[in-house]
């Protein structure tokens, strides 16, 4: 009689090391995630409310949607306006693309993989497994390093080079610190998982090269079940919650800080006037006008 053993494709187990109480964790993460989302929406609402104080626009802002979308995509991909200062542009581009990779290809796909792949479709290994999972892992590692290097460049420029035109603010320091710690704790959590993965499926671990570096560090200090640290369960769970909490704090801080430019800048590009630069809209009923020009902020559009 021949027994065929199932060979598992490469995949990442959701809530690894916490699987025995993952349902409670899932409920808790959803409940806690609502807080920063509300803060984000509230912060953007305050900005929208400020915009609404202006006068109604005389130019159409929602025409030629294809052209507007093209301008927005070109602006996002090239980061053209940021490279007037090379190092500022480099830092911004690395942080922007690194963040987008980690959020959309990481957090969002993981959520889809869990709720659609495992919960709805009942797939044992989720939607993303095999070669697709390995490629995703490598891309996420690149995103993590891009974010870290971008933060380092921005910090050196802000606190070491100190260009005269750059305004120093506590808010900028908080943003850079949050981004850096979120990225590092993400690699740390991954490294603890990969340290165990190396013992069963070492060929998978090379694709997650950032986590692989941390895994070797943890192994060197004994975080592999041998002295001086005999269990990684506590450190892993603690680091996971720190990473999760700071990620939520970062999302909530977007709407209340200069990070909201992620949305406002995109809106400005998409809604910009497509008329020739400097064109003045016609003044209706010019003979009846009692006021000329603008003397208050609320008189601007």
Indicate residue ranges for each PLM-predicted region.
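Membrane-embedded alpha-helical bundles of multi-pass integral membrane proteins
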Residues: 2-301
């Amino acid at each position: 009689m021949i027994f065929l053993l199932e060979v598992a494709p490469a995949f990442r187990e959701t809530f690894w090391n916490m699987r025995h109480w993952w349902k409670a964790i899932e409920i808790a993460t959803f409940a806690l995630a609502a807080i920063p989302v509300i803060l984000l929406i509230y912060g953007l609402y305050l900005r929208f409310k400020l915009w609404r104080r202006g006068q109604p626009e005389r130019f159409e802002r929602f025409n030629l949607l294809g052209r507007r979308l093209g301008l927005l995509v070109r602006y996002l991909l090239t980061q053209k306006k940021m490279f007037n200062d090379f190092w500022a542009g480099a830092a911004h581009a690395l942080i922007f693309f690194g963040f987008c990779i980690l959020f959309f290809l990481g957090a969002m796909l993981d959520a889809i993989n869990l709720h659609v792949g495992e919960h709805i479709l009942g797939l044992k290994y989720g939607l993303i497994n095999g070669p697709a999972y390995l490629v995703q892992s490598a891309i996420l590692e690149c995103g993590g390093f891009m974010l870290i290097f971008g933060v380092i460049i921005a910090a050196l420029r802000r606190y070491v080079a100190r260009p005269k035109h750059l305004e120093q603010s506590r808010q900028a320091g908080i943003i850079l610190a949050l981004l850096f710690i979120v990225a590092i704790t993400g690699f740390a959590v991954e490294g603890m998982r990969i340290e165990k993965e190396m013992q069963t499926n070492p060929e998978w671990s090379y694709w997650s090269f950032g986590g692989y570096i941390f895994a070797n560090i943890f192994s060197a200090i004994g975080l592999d079940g041998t002295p001086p640290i005999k269990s990684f369960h506590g450190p892993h769970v603690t680091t996971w919650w720190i990473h999760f909490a700071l990620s939520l704090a970062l999302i909530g801080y977007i709407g209340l800080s200069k990070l909201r430019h992620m949305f406002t800048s995109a809106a400005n590009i998409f809604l910009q006037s497509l008329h020739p630069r400097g064109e003045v809209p016609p003044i209706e009923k010019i003979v009846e006008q009692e006021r000329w020009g603008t003397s208050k902020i609320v008189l601007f559009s």
